[in-house]
Every structure is written in structure tokens, then in C-alpha cells.
């Protein structure tokens, strides 16, 4: 499939997406610096999020409207306050998209309600990403799919039945290009909860492209995902975790993102195809195999023994498997020590 000017799928390297999220820390200048740092790191896509606190929740401080997870960086924060801190003002979208396009990377967003889809359509967004927490919001999925643009859905927490319902809704609404991202909806996510072996199963089960929305630290999990068929890798991105911000603790810094781009591309290149025998590059190494060599000076008529014939490097003589056949045979001519043994000598 094609997202903007970028091909996405198994025939090309992985599509690496830097997720800005709320790491702009309410500064458009910082947001632009993140775009530029992402492009410099070599990513192919930059994603933001399109919502306001009021499109996400209501302004209540009751217990059920607070984050209650001692392992969460947002422990104790009300949902409304969190989204007020993290949201990207809608008037920033156009300059962010424009700058990303100037730098040659695909800019797109995650809409969280239908008004966000309508707004992103006015910006000619090239695709849509549905977040894990919205992957059961069938009306939203249908609205985004109805645009006819590629649709990316994170699968965090979703059962097979829930995913089946969401995928059917997307396709019924007109989605033809679908990508499902394996995702562990914890922040950060431990590698053991990532379950990457799900990737090939997702691809087979839903006949679509697959990828990873990676909340683990480091690059190892993403590299492994590419080895298992991921065509898309999404990682949260910030200028520096030390700067703080709602998602900074589990976001990649520029040097790490650059490493991710390089290592996932290497992993994809290494996949190759099912193949045996020497590659073109390996053929010159065949000479360093072991083969049969005469290791003592011999006169015509001398008998070959284990003392005067050995399997050694280089590989210009008979293969070692013929040692048993040549032992006990006489040489036809004088043979100098270090001569590759061939059938013409016995």
C-alpha cells in the first residue's frame, strides 16, 4: 500500500513513525524542534494526536475519572487534566504537517472522535491511526475508514472477537488498506508483555499488514518485530526525557531513534528469502573450505596414507569425503608437498 509518497509493506523496509504525543510540552516551537529532530533521525512518518479535553472526557475529579495505577507516570491525575496537558492545539496541526512534508516525512494523526476526522480531512491527512483505547469505538473506526484512506489500528487489550468486529466495520465502511499494530497498553511496557509471536497470526487472521506500537524501552523489541514481519514501527519520541512531559519517561531520544531506524532496516534486509548454497558474495570464500592436500614430498608410485594426505585449508583439492577412496592408492607422478590432490594424480 501507499501512505502519501511512501510505500508500506513487506517489499520495502519498515515504516518508522515517531509519535510526538504531548511531548511538545505546550510549546509550538518545541513541537517544530521535535519534527526536525525526527526527520534528522531518519524516520519516515511523524504522528500527532487530534483531540481536546472535552472530546475525550468530562471535567470531573471523581475517583473513576482519575488514573489509579501506581506504575503509571500519570498516577493520581484526572483524565481531564491529563488531556489538557497533553493535547496538541488544532491550530498547530497545519504548521506541523507543513514542516514535516518540507522535510520529506509523512505527517498524520490519531483522531479521537468524528470532529477530529472532519478536521484532519480538511488538512488532507494521508491516513488515520486509531489508538488502542479507541479500538472498540466502531463508529469512530467507520468514520475514519469511510475516508478511503489507509487505516492503522492499534490492538492493545483487544480480544480476537473485538478485533474482528473492528476490522469488519472498517472494511464495510470502505477501508481497503489496513494495518494492525500489536501493542501492549502499558507505559512503559515490559518486553515479556509484548507477545510478538502474535504478529504472523494477526497477518494471517485478518489478511492485512501488521506492525508494532512499541512502548518498551530501547530498540530490541522493535528489531525483533521486523524479523517477525512488522511493516510499521511506531515509537514515542521526545527531544530529551530529562525535559519532562506527559509521555517523556517512555519516549525515545534522537540518538536512540536514529539507532532504531538503522537497526530495523538491517533486520529487514537480513530477512532475505529461503535460500541455500553460496551467495554471490560468499563464492570467493569457497576457497577456504577444507580439501585434500599432499603434505609430504612423494615419488611416482608412492602410496597415499594418512601421514602424507590431509584435509586442510584451502579448498582447491578433492573434498574431504573422498579421503577413504584415495588412501592406499599410488600416485602417478612425483608430487610436491602442498599440492592439491586431484583424481589425475592417482
Indicate where each model-derived feature is located.
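Catalytic cores and adjacent flexible loops of soluble metabolic enzymes
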Residues: 1-346
